[in-house]
Amino acid sequence: MKLRFWGVRGSFPVPGNLTARYGGNTSCVEVRCADNSHPDAPRLILDAGTGLRRLGKEMMQSEFAEGTGTAHLLVSHTHWDHIQGLPFFAPLYQAGNRFHVYARQRDDTHLRTVFALQSDNPYFPVPFEAAAADLEFTELSDDARFNIGPVQVRCTRLNHPWIAIAFRLDYEGASV
């Protein structure tokens, strides 16, 4: 598997010269199957922090610009620094694209509602309903196990304020 770190900061983005080496965006990691030769090799995205905006710009140079892209977004938890990039994610507004969104089930509200509320007036000028891509939300238990194509995903609860889970990804003998 190949990883690309689009955002590694916590709590809030910190742009500037002091963060140039590792970047100033919040949590977003792209995981690709090593050679993408498997016909079902998925594009995986871990968390939707501000790094998601830059990833989205790059994705719009591929099939996502034509509305034929598919990706899987695994969200560890819905604190602001892990979801604040979603309203700025260009592929989300391209009809035909498909996004499967996975996160820990919450007791207080549905996952789709959490994402919609951050784009609600007066917080953001574009409502979540303007997203033209096809979105599928899957709410997970702490110990969920499932496959995304040839990638096995295992979840475990984290010791973190509120509700958070970690994802272990296994593909052809490699693990992340």
Positions of the model-derived regions?
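Binuclear metal-dependent hydrolase catalytic cores
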Residues: 1-176
